[in-house]
């Protein structure tokens, strides 16, 4: 009797990656790393004067009994202020350096605490990768495993725009703390869940709370730093995110051996230690404190929120369940794509025509579509994140299948990439703000990322010629590829991506009007998470479909349910039941299909490289002396 599970298993993109338990560590990361996004961040530091102008105007109109809105007169005054003389601009820049009220050790604690929330969210994205089989065994609910990943993604993405808009009209401190509490409460639900349904609910709310923490962190760092310091501080977010992402599976694997529930309780322990800092040291920032709650909520685009939530949900579900839980041509997947298209069209019409909202209150910054620099930054952010995060996910999977690595070993294999990525992010934050140019970072980074991903991919015949292969049917990346080759390309990839993967958050704040800064950072967040989600979805689809078809040929006696159970990692130590020859063929089939996933990565790098050629050559982040 077969030792494999024989359940009819629906799997999301993520679960169909694990062939056996020892080879599954990073597989479930394919959908668990979804960098958070937000929308409509409150006015960042450079718009501080415009914000007060807007508040003063609103206060005057409110006291006169008029409708509290930003009038055309206020917009005109704002434009005049943004075109002041160079001397006036220099004076504002000089005064802006002292806007922060927290300095010294309290400021250090504040930065560490908000960055720690990013670390927890990144950790929660990937820590679940190693505990999926344990959860399935405890709850005896293999059929619902896909929702552990999809629910987390839906919970976060669904509130992208609505939550970001709330940050623009409510007190930043308390909305951030509310997001922290929601994330912690959801972690408690996941840890104490009595069944799979409760676990899924906890994952959904954890995704929503985590994105709220990310948006709040970006806001707090932006409004409390000057133009000169902001790139350096925002680069720390990418650094912490990368560290948390890599450590997630390692920590998850450790808890699986003890009790998987502590993978969620860990958030509560760290959160309890940091909560006093969040509560007492976080500065309050209220964009419209003089307005009543009803007046503030009247600025919220409820129709846009409903449409965006529906559009995101119906887009994520078919991408994740297509080809695994359901066939791509099934009625369910087709219906979801159709509904998604209709909702996106409705959202576009509603936003462009400002139906049931106003130009100042709508969810999406439609005006950015006419800004060349903003659109190029959006494209580059989406493309470069896809180019770097696809390898971050698939390189560990490669080592698990080809070398039999576990959680710790496969994480160590990523160190060349992560170390160079984090180091370059920090260097970029310092040097870009010092010299003022951003175009070279994107251009050189695109070249490096393209070269690295091309050599990690199966290219016929280009890659074969470059490495003097004579057999064009042999991929550069196969089960016997030298580790030194891979480490070298990892380092090159990290060196290239680090210069631009996080830079867009700071750059876009210099290329849009001050009155639009509330939209600017969230605009890049949408590109970042969209690029990661789309890139991983496409790469995993290439890998999963190819690997599944190959294994069906090699293992024709296995039923679909048994094959899916083995691939997902819930079917036991499957490879150990195979003879040596079949085991080698299975590993080769998986690795060869995995190499094809890097096509998505080098395509993203190519798009980023081409888009970077259109950037302006002007200097930004000018020092006060230079501005004068």
Swiss-Prot record:
Q: Does the keyword Repeat apply?
A: no
Q: What is its main location?
A: membrane
Gene3D superfamilies the UniProt entry points to = MFS general substrate transporter like domains
Q: Describe the family membership recorded for this protein in Swiss-Prot or TrEMBL.
A: Belongs to the major facilitator superfamily. TCR/Tet family.
Q: Which UniProt keywords apply?
A: Cell membrane, Membrane, Transmembrane, Transmembrane helix, Transport
Q: Write out the transmembrane intervals.
A: 102-122, 150-170, 174-194, 204-224, 232-252, 262-282, 302-322, 329-349, 375-395, 407-427, 435-455, 488-508, 524-544, 595-615
GO terms for cellular component: plasma membrane
InterPro entries, per this entry? MFS (IPR011701), MFS_dom (IPR020846), MFS_trans_sf (IPR036259)
Domain of life per record: Eukaryota
Query: Where is this protein localized, as stated in its record?
Result: Cell membrane
Topology relative to the lipid bilayer, per the entry, is:
Multi-pass membrane protein
Q: Does the keyword Lyase apply?
A: no
Known role = MFS-type transporter; part of the gene cluster that mediates the biosynthesis of phomenoic acid, a long chain aliphatic carboxylic acid that does not appear to be essential for pathogenicity but may play a role in allowing to outcompete other fungi in the environmental niche via its antifungal properties. Is probably involved in the efflux of phomenoic acid.
The induction comment states: Expression is positively regulated by the phomenoic acid biosynthesis cluster-specific transcription regulator C6TF.
The protein here is known as Phomenoic acid biosynthesis cluster MFS-type transporter
Any GO molecular function: transmembrane transporter activity
Gene name?
A: MFS
């Amino acid at each position: 009797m077969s030792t494999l599970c024989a359940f009819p298993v629906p799997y999301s993109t993520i679960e169909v990656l694990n062939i056996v338990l020892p080879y599954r560590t990073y597989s479930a990361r394919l959908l668990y790393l979804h960098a958070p996004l937000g929308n409509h961040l409150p006015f960042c530091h450079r718009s501080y004067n415009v914000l007060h102008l807007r508040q003063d105007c609103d206060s005057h109109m409110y006291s006169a009994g008029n409708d509290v809105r930003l009038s055309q007169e206020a917009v005109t005054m704002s434009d005049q202020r943004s075109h002041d003389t160079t001397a006036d601009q220099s004076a504002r820049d000089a005064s802006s350096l002292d806007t922060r009220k927290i300095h010294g050790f309290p400021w250090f604690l504040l930065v560490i605490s908000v960055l720690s929330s990013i670390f927890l969210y990144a950790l929660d994205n990937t820590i679940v990768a190693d505990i999926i089989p344990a959860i399935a065994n405890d709850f005896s609910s293999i059929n619902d495993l896909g929702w552990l990943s999809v629910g987390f993604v839906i919970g976060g993405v669904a509130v992208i725009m609505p939550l970001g808009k709330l940050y623009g009209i409510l007190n930043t401190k308390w909305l951030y703390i509310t997001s922290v509490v929601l994330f912690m409460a959801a972690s408690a639900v996941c840890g104490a869940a009595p069944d799979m349904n409760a676990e899924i609910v906890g994952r959904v709310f954890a995704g929503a709370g985590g994105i709220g923490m990310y948006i709040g962190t970006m806001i707090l760092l932006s409004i409390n730093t000057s133009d000169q310091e902001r790139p350096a501080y925002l680069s720390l977010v990418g650094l912490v995110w990368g560290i948390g992402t890599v450590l997630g599976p390692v920590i998850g694997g450790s808890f699986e051996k003890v009790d998987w529930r502590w993978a969620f309780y860990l958030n509560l322990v760290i959160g309890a230690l940091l909560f006093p800092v969040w509560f007492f040291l976080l500065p309050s920032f209220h964009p419209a404190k003089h307005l009543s709650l009803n007046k503030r909520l009247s600025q919220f685009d409820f129709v846009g929120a409903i449409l965006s939530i529906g559009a995101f949900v119906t887009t994520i579900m078919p991408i994740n369940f297509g080809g695994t839980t359901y066939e791509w041509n099934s009625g369910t997947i087709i219906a979801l794509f159709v509904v998604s298209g209709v909702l996106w069209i409705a959202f576009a019409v509603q936003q462009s025509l400002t139906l049931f909202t106003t130009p100042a209150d709508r969810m999406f910054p439609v005006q950015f579509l006419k800004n060349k620099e903003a659109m190029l930054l959006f494209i580059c952010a989406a493309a470069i994140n896809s180019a770097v995060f696809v390898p971050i996910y698939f390189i560990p999977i490669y080592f698990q299948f080809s070398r039999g690595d576990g959680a710790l070993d496969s994480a160590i294999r990523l160190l060349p990439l992560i170390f160079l990525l984090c180091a370059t992010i920090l260097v970029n934050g310092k040097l870009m703000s010092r010299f003022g140019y951003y175009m070279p970072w994107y251009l050189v980074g695109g070249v490096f990322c393209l070269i690295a991903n091309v050599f990690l991919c199966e290219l016929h015949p280009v890659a074969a010629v470059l490495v003097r292969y004579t057999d064009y049917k042999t991929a550069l990346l196969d089960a016997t590829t030298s580790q030194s080759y891979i480490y070298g390309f990892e380092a090159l990839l990290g060196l290239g991506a680090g210069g631009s993967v996080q830079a867009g958050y700071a750059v876009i704040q210099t290329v849009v009007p001050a009155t639009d800064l509330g939209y600017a950072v969230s605009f890049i967040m949408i590109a970042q998470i969209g690029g990661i989600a789309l890139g991983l979805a496409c790469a995993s689809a290439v890998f999963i479909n190819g690997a599944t078809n190959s294994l069906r040929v090699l293992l024709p006696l296995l039923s679909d349910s048994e094959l899916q159970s083995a691939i997902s990692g819930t079917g036991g130590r499957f490879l150990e039941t195979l003879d040596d020859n079949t085991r080698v063929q299975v590993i080769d089939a998986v690795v060869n299909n995995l190499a094809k996933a890097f096509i998505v990565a080098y395509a993203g790098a190519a798009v980023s490289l081409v888009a970077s050629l259109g950037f302006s050559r002007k200097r930004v982040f000018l020092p006060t002396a230079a501005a004068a």
